[in-house]
Amino acid sequence: VQIALGNHDLDHKDTMEIGTAYEKRFRMPHVQPAIRNLATNDLFYKGETPDFEYFQAKTFVPYEFGNAYYSFVFGPSKHIVLSSYSSFLPGSIQHEWLLSELEHVDRSVTPWLIIMLHCPLYSTFHDHKREIFMTEARVHLEPVFVRHRVNFVVAGHLHSYMRTVPTIDSKPDPRGPIHIIQGNGGRQANEPYINDTVAEEWIKVRDHSMYGYGTLELFNRTHARWKWVKTGFNAEDEGGLHGRFQPDFSLNDEVWVTNQLYVDEDPIPDESLEM
């Protein structure tokens, strides 16, 4: 199991430690041992209720390497897992590591390039939309992903499902990555949409009512298939609470993807690649 650092992994509000349980519980393919420093109060929003036991970060935390970010190869795919909560701004340790990783990817060996991180770059949902971990990623990471023809950017954070068409700078473009939010695996949240009636032009599928999981099959160097399978939903509210779980194991979204690396279009304009 390969996972990405989430806001729920930033540890207990009383310890001021970063990622201690996350480092001890999981073992990812380390680039090098983790570098973690104690947090300071100004890094976090503190919960207003006594039972709020973990941090909500408002800026980047002092956590590098270890389980925070890493990469691995699986068959014909190169996977790069990033930390949304370690700085990824230009010149940061993580950003420099990411650039080095991407520059050394051999697409003749691993033609599929997949990025995973907790916070999405694109979201049709209202919650978290102003967090810097999303807004700054669009500014500083999207141009890098586009330049290197990343195929998929897979995230969570929002407890719902979303799939975009290949997108560059908020416009459908066959050369751009497909952005997926697969955050509806367990927690019911009914994330509100930014616009209830009309989805953004880069949206292909969005859903905030179902639980589910996704699968990605890589058939060859040019074609892959993504599926989102729903597992159920909560019935109508009962007494102000979420209703009883209703199983429903049916296919809810399926798409065949042509590897963007082989899309023959005009070169991507230089201004789209600026960091």
Model region roles, listed by residue range:
Residues 1-113, 128-141, 162-207, 212-217:
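Extended active-site neighborhood of metal-dependent phosphoesterases/phosphodiesterases
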Residues 122:
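ATP-dependent adenylate-handling ligase core
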